[in-house]
Amino acid sequence: MAAPRRLIVGMAGAPGASYTVSLLGRLRQLGVESHLVTCGCSRSIIYSETGLGLRQLCSRADGWYHERNQAAAISSGSFLNLGMVIMPCTMRSLAAIVTGVADNLVQRAADVTLKEGRRLVLAMAESSSSRIGQENLRHAEDLGVRILVLPPAGPTLTVAEKNEEILACFGLGDAAARAPAPR
């Protein structure tokens, strides 16, 4: 059975909220249902980067979940979807995902996404020069995770291009034909 056109969008903190706001708008344009989960650290950054309050951000998604709600629909493999993107993703969240630790709903939904063989894209807000960080990135890629690095949010064109790259990972958007096939 084909997955419904729905995508889980996680925000794990760090700079990059403008990318998420733009992605939610683009998903709505494409008629793709979006389910947003935010961590506390990301909520504190949203306003400073975008001028939006949490309610305004959540109104751009079809569903919103609190990070502590591990019983949410998106924490179950029976919640059919195209996959998940965590944007921005921190090195801490990456480490939790590759080790199977699920302390919050962002990490739990990522764990379920991998378990179900769905596409997981981590849009890293930072690159790591530490050996541990590099090993975690390699481990994630070995698990089939697509890793992207977010440049500092700047021109609208840069944000739009990165979002099209993310959408293409799921067979969506203008760049879908140029991306590797979703797994």
Which residue stretches match the model-derived regions?
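A cross-family phosphate/adenosyl-ligand binding-site feature
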Residues: 1-121, 125-183
